[in-house]
Curated annotation (Swiss-Prot):
Residues 6-70 form the J domain. GO terms for cellular component: cytoplasm. It comes from Erysipelothrix rhusiopathiae. This is Chaperone protein DnaJ. The gene is dnaJ. The lineage of its organism: Bacteria, Bacillati, Bacillota, Erysipelotrichia, Erysipelotrichales. Zn(2+) 2 binds at residues 164, 167, 190, 193.
Length: 370
């Protein structure tokens, strides 16, 4: 059997990584290799490898054991605990359980308790207007749902569920080895019951003993108005299957918002550039400006300069939390004609003649340097 890879190496973090760094690395890798997203060969194996690493490193006690003993802390038959004691402890199983996370006084952590399933991650691309006003979307997923026939037990009836004879219902087996250095003891999941502490004499005919059925379901996703790229939506119970009757994990959907041809969003404000002729900027005019809420009349005062910005109050995006509306900013971009008719040129030449009598714009500019 090939050696297992180092769990820290799998997640791409250092051995001094914080819980937050480990969780962040896991989420990124889980999204990258999830079988529902990544169809490449080997992706599913990598996904399982990432899950196994996170299961250990996200648990402070398991992580401490792993840091001290490596994979041997969880492999059956390995020397996970060095004793070297000649007496004073009658029950080495209790010592081992206490060392590996059980309570004191002979109380062990129940390995058969309900465990929530792993969360599932995916991304969803929506267009600009869907992010502004919200939308209703749907995704199709494979979801493990509790068998309605056996209610998750996997057995044909309650009488077909028996306490595992190998582990006595604990779900764990303990192996002891005596060496010249003392007693080495390890604990592993029971191979007969798979850690459940129960065995089934007759399986459920509906789910064939699994306790669940995999279904292809369509999940409705409500996109709230005002959402931005990077924000996540959570759908409860649509993640990976839980263990020992525990609930399913959750589905997290990271939103990616597309760009718009004309509008640009900054926070809850919308920005747009509008073309304006030199004549309209000089004499002033009234125009209808596109907004995400429809056209709005805007008065351009005479003498408007290039790149002037006008503010349209509450014509932006609704804030996701407070509900307040952002604004829209309209920036003027002057368009200088490249071709003129004879009549237009004559009018402009006449206008230029009136300017020559005084200082031109450029003349006033030069005087500022003297």
């Amino acid at each position: 059997m090939a050696d297992k890879r180092d769990f820290y190496e799998i997640l791409g973090v250092s051995k001094s990584a914080t819980d937050a760094e480990i969780k962040k690395a896991y989420r990124q890798l889980a999204k990258k290799y999830h079988p529902d997203i990544n169809k490449e060969d080997g992706a599913e194996a990598k996904f399982k490898e990432v899950q196994e690493a996170y299961e250990v490193l996200s648990d402070s006690q398991k992580r401490a054991n792993y840091d001290q003993f490596g994979h041997a802390a969880f492999d059956q038959g390995a020397g996970g605990f060095g004793g070297g004691f000649s007496g004073g402890f009658d029950d080495f199983g209790d010592i081992f359980s206490s060392f590996f996370g059980g309570g004191g006084g002979g109380q062990r952590r129940n390995p058969n308790g309900p465990m929530k399933g792993q969360d599932r991650f995916m991304s969803m691309r929506i267009d600009f207007m869907e992010a502004v006003f919200g939308a209703n979307k749907s995704v199709t997923l494979n979801v493990d749902e509790e068998c309605t026939s056996c209610h998750g037990s996997g057995a044909h009836s309650k009488d077909d569920i028996k306490t595992c004879s190998r582990c006595g219902g604990t779900g764990q087996t303990v192996t002891q080895q005596r060496t010249p250095f003392g007693v080495f003891q390890s604990q592993a999941t029971c191979p007969d019951c798979g850690g459940s502490g129960k065995t089934i004499t007759k399986r459920c005919g509906e789910c064939h003993g699994k306790g669940f059925n995999t279904k292809r379901v369509e999940v409705d996703i409500k996109i709230p108005a005002g959402i931005v790229t990077g924000q996540q939506l959570r759908v409860s119970g649509k993640g990976e299957r839980g263990a020992n009757g525990g609930p399913n994990g959750d589905l997290f959907i990271e939103i990616v918002v597309g760009t718009h041809k004309h509008f640009r969003r900054e926070g809850n404000d919308i920005h747009i550039n509008i073309p304006l002729s030199v004549i309209d900027a000089t004499l002033g005019t009234e125009i209808e400006v596109p907004t995400v809420h429809g056209d709005v009349k805007l008065t351009i005062p005479a003498g408007t300069q290039p790149n002037t910005k006008f503010r349209l109050r509450e014509k932006g995006v609704q804030d996701l939390r407070s509900g307040r509306m952002g604004d829209q900013y309209v920036e003027v971009k002057l368009e200088v004609p490249t071709k003129l008719s004879r009549q237009q040129r004559e009018h402009l030449e006449a206008l230029k003649e009136t300017e020559v009598k005084g200082d031109s714009v450029f003349d006033r500019f030069k005087k500022a340097f003297k």
